[in-house]
Amino acid sequence: MNNFMAKVAAINDVINTFVWVKIGIVLLLGAGLVMTVCTRFFQVSFIGHWFKQTLGSLLKKDSEATRKTDKKSISAFQSLCTALAATVGTGNIAGVSAAIVIGGPGAVLWMWVAAFLGMMTKYSEIVLGMFYRRRNADGEWSGGSMYFLRDGLGKKRGLKTVSAVLAVLFALFAILASFGIGNMGQVNKITLNLQSAFFKNVSAELLGVPAVNLVIGLVLMVLTALIVIGGLQRIASFAEKVVPVMAILYIIGGIVIVCMNITAVGDVFASIFKFAFGIKAVAGGAAGVAIAQVITQGCKRGMFSNEAGLGSSVMVHASANTKEPVKQGMWGIFEVFFDTIVVCTMTALVVLCSGFIDLSTGLPAVANLNDATLISQIFGQAFGFVGEAFIAIAMFLFAFTTVVGWSQYGTKAVEYLFGTTGVKVYKVIFVLMIMSGAVMTSSLAWDISDTFNGLMMIPNLIGVVALCPLVAKITKNYIAREIKGEKIEPMVSYNPEEK
């Protein structure tokens, strides 16, 4: 078993290095910059408008954002919560901790940069996903990168075959990613944190595997099956109730920790900018961190968290009953803002003001720092067992909702490749894979997730950038109609019957 895992790790390392170090970061930041310029910095130019259309709309009675129009679709708010269920996961806690431990405080700045540019990548993905969506055999909306790759990019001269191949590759990588970022990586963090908080003294093993891991894996399999079998409606209903509560409670807990260390906040922000371009080696001690490592960690963990560039959440946003692609796209901007600028930043502040990171050197102040349980240690240091238990429960909710949300992404990818008949088989495999995450080593589960992220990102961003003129045209059309009040024909679908 150990030899097999070693071979898997070696193969994954080769692919991961190529995808992320060679091309991934450049492609991710480059695409975000292109779409930001293409939409004329929409996330800044119309910041008041998209806040009003998203967060502001939730304050209205009988808002369009929370209203469902039919049994086969979900509301815009439900689509946001389902997307946030998939994005607000272990990446917001363990992922940010890992970025800081490996890349230093400066990784936080690059996480922000990736989020700023990622807002428009996410927006563009959703706009295209909404524009090229269609009803499936069961009457449900189906949309995603595979559809705009095939039907959008495929309309360009000489690209029909290439676009069809890219669409299939995206769907295939999405299925694999659903087992990585959406399953094994999340379950692994749940297991580690529950062990750390509640089962420190349990050492029983079964077949060479800790019995606690097997029990946790089994319980998670049952819980996931109960929700996933109910399809999108049950997933959306679950997400709508759980996501807002879990996020608010975690933010409140983070604010309390930061307030307890309020005198360190100034030094925290100073260290973020000071070490954004690398960390010099300490004389007679620890090695430094190269700028490439800082940027890579910040961007990688940022994208792992908000998933801008993956094209993943498009598959659930496209199920919303909203007609306007731009209106749903603005929920994507808010999704990245809330996930990274709010939740991930809160985690970063908690880690950096805790004393576990030396703000004068940018390096860990404690030897052999475990990023997987770092936040748990910090809360435990402040509140004892209650703090550790709080983070274990928060991690469970964050990660479990991600598993549930990603099951829907994988479902839509399977539907594209094999039709609705293949969905049941996929759901069974997805539930069974949970056990692998419970018994796998932390680093390997995380590395495999990184690799699948990158592979999924490549065809998606090729399609987004290639269709940049269409995104700009749809955005310009919306601004003219909804903001400037011009009476022109709306651009809401490639299919005339859906207009």
Where are each of the predicted segments found?
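Transmembrane helix-loop junctions in multi-pass membrane proteins
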Residues: 7-8, 38-43, 91-96, 178-191, ...
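Extracellular/periplasmic helix-exit of transmembrane alpha-helices
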Residues: 123-133, 255-271, 279-286, 319-320, ...
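Alpha-helical membrane segments and immediately flanking helix-loop junctions
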Residues: 62-100, 131-153, 169-175, 288-337
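Helix-loop-helix module between adjacent transmembrane segments
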Residues: 34-36, 114-139, 150-188, 196-227, ...
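N-terminal alpha-helical transmembrane segments of multi-pass membrane transport
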Residues: 1-90, 100-107, 118, 259, ...
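Membrane-interface loop-to-helix entry segments
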Residues: 27-52, 166, 184-194, 212-273, ...
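Flexible loop linkers connecting adjacent transmembrane helices
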Residues: 42-74, 98-108, 112, 120-161, ...
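Selective recognition of specific alpha-helical transmembrane segments in multi-pass small-molecule
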Residues: 117-125, 217-232, 243-263, 296, ...
